[in-house]
Amino acid sequence: MKDISKYQGIIPAFYACYDEKGEISPEGVEALTRYMIEKGVKGVYVGGSSGECIYHSVSERKLVLEHVMKAAEGKLTVIAHVACNNTADSCELAAHAESL
């Protein structure tokens, strides 16, 4: 049986962070990630529908995940939602998530 202990505890959906222009804020994403770590969150679910993924382009979804991973520094279990309304984009997001 595989160890599933990394999936215990609080694992909320991660909300995207925006700047004054309505663009994804890498700094905001990193700050929210660090805040969640400080508050005892054990993992995050990035890119799901609660995190506005249906409104984001593939490049925006990649950007959010990249900055979550950067700020998490291995301290969080990160679950990357990669589903899209077409297979090619889902495959692209899955390959990107795996590369991080």
Feature map (PLM): residue ranges:
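Active-site beta->alpha loop and helix N-cap motifs at the rims of alpha/beta catalytic domains
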Residues: 2-12, 17-100
